[in-house]
Amino acid sequence: MLETEHANTEVHELCRQMIARIEKYGTLEGFSDSDILEVLKTIKEILEPLPCLIEIIAPVVVFGDIHGQLGDLLQFTNEVGRPPDFQYLFLGDYVDRGPNSLEVTVWLFCMKILFSKKVHLLRGNHEVRRVNTMYGFKEEMMRKRNSHLWKVFNDVFAELSICASINRKILCMHGGISPKIESWDSLTGMTKPRVHGDCEHGLIVDLIWSDPNRKDDTIQFNKMRGISTLFGKSVVDNLCTTLAIDLIIRAHEMKEKGHTFEFDNRLLTVFSAPYYSGHNSNLGSVATISKSLKLRIVTLKPNKGYDRSKLDKRTLHDFEKNFQPLDENPRKNISCQFNVPPNGQKMSPFLGEYSMFAHETQFCKKDNETPVKKPYSSNQDEDHSVLDMIRKTQKGYGVEVSLKDKVMSLESIRKKLGMTTSTTPPPPRTPSPDAPLAQSPPIPRSPPSSTENA
């Protein structure tokens, strides 16, 4: 018993060190393959006994696709708060596309080890060996580590749960729902798809791969994916009635605003990778659900005004060396912010919060101050030239913040839908292009990769 406790203490300390290194430098350099294997061994032991359907009690923050975009992941956690004070549910697709799939996954695993009751991880379609062989994770692992570690990561992915319920009122998964779900027993009776082929048939393939059918209400083969099905509004309505739930939350698709409500607000798609693949102008969102099941969206807005191709190698090198970590004890902050990324990548200023109906918003005013130009310096203690150059690229970006008393609960939404089921909520207001940006610490960002769906 003492040996086990001592071993756990050592692993926990290793996880803390890895998290600190990842958040400060965006890398795992300095840690051996054996260190990573120790984390993988521990997380596998934690995940193995978990069922396919995990039960969660609100409050919780729900994350969509991450896709190796480490900086955006850290910025989200910096804004919404961190465990043990806050609970997380991740809907999958941690790897591929972005450059930091390794660091994102290790960060998530370490957080799960340290806060096993507060961090919940689901499996996405990119946590399938065949998929992450083709879309970047294997290549990244071969470049940073070795193929053996890539195989072990996929063994751990096979132990991830498939779906989650929040207070038995909200059902969450990566892909979508299935007409094969007849009751809660259909979900609790699933077996984890530990063999690759098990991910490609039955109920599980739909939970990982399916998409909404926005053209008509029929169930069709998902031609775009080449696998699984498309489900319509009637399937959503029937499932909500059958399971007595109010909302379904899924990920799997890039959304321009970072999220979308569909089918009388019973289906929410959330996508947490802003400026996806570096070529899109999409926002990224997470959903926060309070203890009373009040729903709020937190969104990151990408910045088009900064391109790594405009920086010379000397400036990039100094910028990387001067990278600073996020706050160790972040607090929720909905004020105007601006995040300077390392490596000259696209910037993601924090857009703010608003309720699902975005009833009222307030905007910051445009900052007309002209920054003072300072000479280039390679001194690690002075990064003025880089920051000045970035400030010159700014044109002013909107920061939208909700009024907190405008957030609606799921119960009030249900009552409203019961009165006027044909009424749809007004779309969120377009953020002002003339808002100012306040300075905040830099964070890592992902480079261009692909514009395909998650």
Curated annotation (Swiss-Prot):
Entry-linked Pfam families: Metallophos (PF00149)
Cofactor binding mode and count: Binds 2 manganese ions per subunit.
Claim: Hydrolase is one of the keywords in the record: yes
Catalytic site: 126
Entry EC no(s): 3.1.3.16
Family: Belongs to the PPP phosphatase family. PP-1 subfamily.
Source organism (scientific name): Caenorhabditis elegans
Gene Ontology CC annotation, any one: nucleus
Annotated residues for binding of Mn(2+) 2: 93, 125, 174, 252
Protein name: Putative serine/threonine-protein phosphatase C27B7.6
Chain intervals with Pro residues compositional bias: 424-447
Domain of life per record: Eukaryota
Catalytic reaction annotation: O-phospho-L-seryl-[protein] + H2O = L-seryl-[protein] + phosphate; O-phospho-L-threonyl-[protein] + H2O = L-threonyl-[protein] + phosphate
